[in-house]
């Protein structure tokens, strides 16, 4: 397309992560001229490590994704853990059905993003790495391109996939600077281990792996949680904490991270490992609230982290699958706009329609109350200790007479200092939120 002399491309996509690459690829596949701009010298260089990718959405874009893409391991075991200072209560779930087709994989973005970029180039996308977009070109309220240094690049539509600190969304007036209660800070390490050592310690084999979601003393009482998952020859482990609660605690994010790695249940798993990577990253904590607002302007759509498509339910932390899903919804709306030659606000708002009809919009609505539920401090300070006390009462076989489990649980509850109404309230809130 791009036949008009004052237009360089049909679409300019800013950001070469999962969202930006998927959107650019799909639009090029539909026959449009697309420019993908990436700030890093190569795609993936600005992304911290990777994560657990619930990857079935990628089969819609790249059939055989889990076989062809540079993924680390397939997650067939999921563990939910309550961590206390001297105890570790763990629910360990394994299911062969999660293996074929692959439900979730671990990825390292330094490997995945370049692969996605290559796929984009094969589809006809012009990929421009090492370029920082400075501002939008706005004429009569319409976004018509971007400025990068002294250069102007014009297009019918701009797609912003520039991450959680999206200055494009801020410049367009879609987002203001996020309050700290909507942000979380993640601190992650990647620890290298020989493949056999890793597989023996984590009880995984072949291409399969395990992911842990942890809560409690792992964040030293700060609202948030911890994660740990196996890559091919490394383990990614870290904490994610709500920024306002972390600041109020007086703790440093790095100290909390180190506290997790030294826990008696964690340290042996990482013993003699080599630190391959360490870093911090801001993420969205209240994604459902953010994405409920505007995501478009005439000639502009916002996708992925830039729009707030992250979801933490306490059991799973999702971002990449939602990023890919939002990219597909945006590509559908932009394709319709290009076919009609209409780049008005109304045309861009078709993005919202496609979102609401997709699993992305439906899941964000389903878990809209999850962030508020996860703010409850008892989640991080009381329930882990209660669980440990109950199990201690069950498994501690001293010389005193045994009691029924119900009696053990009731006695542990009485000693916990929790009020019955608080537990009922939290339970009801959890049912509604999750």
Question: For each of these PLM feature ranges, what is it?
Answer:
Residues 88-109, 145, 240-243:
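Helix-loop-beta segment of a Rossmann-like dinucleotide-binding subdomain
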Residues 119-266:
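Predominantly flavin-linked oxidoreductase catalytic cores and closely associated redox partners
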Residues 218-223, 232, 245-326, 343-349, ...:
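FAD/FMN-dependent oxidoreductases across multiple families
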Residues 329-380:
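Active-site-proximal substrate-binding core of FAD-dependent oxidoreductases
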Residues 374-434:
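C-terminal auxiliary extensions adjacent to catalytic cores
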